Swiss-Prot record:
Species of the source: Plasmopara viticola
Gene responsible for this protein: RXLR21
High-level lineage: Eukaryota, Sar, Stramenopiles, Oomycota, Peronosporales
Signal sequence bounds: 1-21
Name listed for the protein in its UniProt record: Secreted RxLR effector protein 21
Record family assignment: Belongs to the RxLR effector family.
GO cellular component assignments: extracellular region; host cell cytoplasm; host cell nucleus
Amino acid sequence: MNLSTLLLTLACISQLHGGSANQATDIMRRQLRMGKAVASLLENQHQSARELEENIMADEDNKANEVQADVSQFRVRRLRSPNYVELIELRG
């Protein structure tokens, strides 16, 4: 099991056990930042840790906060087993 899988597993477990989704999101973002810093450090060994942190924070600040999505409509169809459903996208 590699490190990123372990971190993702820990983040998911903390999200399930924690009461706040924002808290879990902050943990995942922090872990992602740390992973980016380590990867960037391995690629750019001549940079200092402070420069790496500033670059990563600038990259994160430039990203949009919301995900843009097109409106879609779906129809749910139950299959023979009550545990399975099929989503059919309606073309409009």
